[in-house]
Amino acid sequence: MWLGDYSLINLLGIFLQATFIQNILLSTFLGMCSYLACSSRLSTANGLGMSVALVLTITGSINWLIHHFVTGPHALSWLSPALANIDLSFLELITFIVVIAAFTQILELLLERFSRNLYLALGIFLPLIAVNCAILGGVLFGITRNYPFLPMVVFSLGSGCGWWLAIVLFATIREKLAYSDIPQHLQGMGISFITTGLIAMAFMGLTGIDISKPTAKSVVISDTSTNKSKTTSAQERLSSNHKA
């Protein structure tokens, strides 16, 4: 339930896959509004990316607990066997959004108290983290893949770091583009979308690499196939002896 068939090397694989191979922004284009609006300066993009990674990691963990102990199939069976058939799945989506909004509000208060400059730089886009589809999408992706708890935490962290990496890369390029001679009709959103597409194409080179599968399952499968082959060969030897 907490680690499942995943080993520590599998957790590293999940993190790398969520960050680079299946980058939540560059492969699914979730969270594009904040990505385009807050990437004109590297410092602002870095602060927003760090905030998104923090919110996604913590809310992903909390929402996993809610799914497995409250709203998921047979989730209430830990309270009483009589409650096992109660279905609260209709509350799941709104509950996830409430958790994300509540933690975003807490983060906003902390930034206002301890990092006033970053709070002012992010402006209206800080509370909009609550409705950033990348955060809700990351939570839903992890739950639909039936990750145990620790792999879910690592996947949420990797997805958040992937979003952070994408916006930092884009902000770095945009600062260079500010001094470039760009055709008039491509200035603004035009060159931004072209740049994002080129970054996404670079990450597409990693498509097809899967390093997040649990090794325990593959070991069990290989052991089972070995035992089957041994049984088959033994049966063949027995039948040949009978014929002789």
UniProtKB/Swiss-Prot annotation:
Known EC number: 7.2.1.1
Membrane-spanning ranges: 11-31, 47-67, 90-110, 123-143, 153-173, 189-209
GO cellular component entries: Gram-negative-bacterium-type cell wall; plasma membrane
Primary role: NQR complex catalyzes the reduction of ubiquinone-1 to ubiquinol by two successive reactions, coupled with the transport of Na(+) ions from the cytoplasm to the periplasm. NqrA to NqrE are probably involved in the second step, the conversion of ubisemiquinone to ubiquinol.
Subunit structure: Composed of six subunits; NqrA, NqrB, NqrC, NqrD, NqrE and NqrF.
GO MF annotation list: oxidoreductase activity, acting on NAD(P)H, quinone or similar compound as acceptor
Subcellular location: Cell inner membrane
Family according to the record: Belongs to the NqrDE/RnfAE family.
Matching HAMAP family: NqrE
One Pfam entry name: Rnf-Nqr
InterPro entries to which the protein is assigned, alphabetical: NqrDE/RnfAE, NqrDE/RnfAE_oxidrdctase, NqrE
Record bears the keyword Transmembrane helix: yes
Protein name: Na(+)-translocating NADH-quinone reductase subunit E
EC main group: translocase
Any one GO BP annotation for this protein: respiratory electron transport chain
Entry membrane topology: Multi-pass membrane protein
